[in-house]
Amino acid sequence: MSSLPLIVLTALLAQSSAPAPDYAFFKERVQPIFLKKRPGHARCLTCHDHGSPPLQPLSPGAATWDEEQSRKNFAVWKQFIKPGDPLKSPLLRHPLAEEAGGDRFHAGGKHFKSQSDPEWQTLAAWVNGEKLDPKTNGGTQ
């Protein structure tokens, strides 16, 4: 008897147990990271409003994205994560210093020196399926 069906079933179960990325968490916690200016670096939006992967350009005079733009950003950026596995997610590896587990890719430089950086931790929380707690109006569950 072949063990192939068991291997396929195990792989499917592992995929189905991965947490789904949460839109509300993305909108309230992840998107502000894309807008934040960091010393020595441009904001993510500066390159990614016309780069790959893209962020929606801000509307004239807007400080953040509207609902439609946020949903488009979510649809694009969730493709650059591996739910449940931050270190296999390009969104987290590319801007992370190589000595901290990042890779050499990211023309925009290394925004995070370590995995303990609070913003890197926020991105990791999203990849790990963290959700906002509606009872605390934006707290996490």
How would you name each of these model-derived features?
Residues M1-L9:
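Sec-dependent signal peptide recognition
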Residues L13-Q141:
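Aromatic- and Gly/Pro-enriched helix-to-coil junctions and flexible linker segments
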